[in-house]
Amino acid sequence: MPPKDLLGDRDKAGRPEEINRWLVENGGKDKVAVISSDAMIYGSLVASRKHHIPRDLLLRRVKNIEKLHDTHPKMPIYVFSSIMRTPKDGASSGTEEPEYYVKYGKAIANYTKIDNADTSGLNESYQVTLREGVPEAALKDWLSRRRTNLEVNKPVSYTHLTL
């Protein structure tokens, strides 16, 4: 296991590049590696929910995970990912979501229920009400981060890292 000072927790992000460096240098000493993609890409699970990390840096960190197999070809590498959640309201989010979620969490949760759904049965004014219940900047931030996290998780999910 990497040194604790490299790992994140609910209050601070870890150091993905240094965790990767540690795995490259020390990974071959173990029979198997079980890796959190959230730690390797964002710094921690909580950091994956609050980040403003550029997409190109996130994708480079995904490549670091993929390269571990090349570095340690005989070591099975199991990578797990968490899909970004949408708590039902601000009270359920604790301190693990952006600050605006405390105030607008319920409205964001309701909006995301219909965001990619078939809304043909919903009254148009209800859809507008859901969108207007959240400041545009907060909704844009939330949806952008969800989209980024999904895009970054896709290559992790479909690589051949589990052998």
Question: Which functions belong to the PLM regions below?
Answer:
Residues M1-N20:
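Basic, amphipathic N-terminal segments that precede the first structured/catalytic domain
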Residues P2-D5, V34-L45, F80-M84:
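Short loop/turn segments at strand-loop or loop-helix junctions that form parts
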Residues P16-I19, H51-I65, W142-V156:
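Well-ordered, non-membrane alpha-helical segments in soluble/globular domains
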Residues E17-K29:
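Short, well-structured alpha-helical segments in soluble
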Residues I41-I53, A91-Y100:
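Surface-exposed, active-site-proximal loop segments in enzymatic domains
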Residues H72-I77:
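A short helix->loop->beta-strand "cap" motif at the edges of active sites that frequently abuts
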Residues E97-V152:
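Acidic, His- and aromatic-enriched active-site or binding-groove loops in soluble protein domains
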Residues T159-T162:
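Conserved small/polar residues in nucleotide/adenosyl-binding loops
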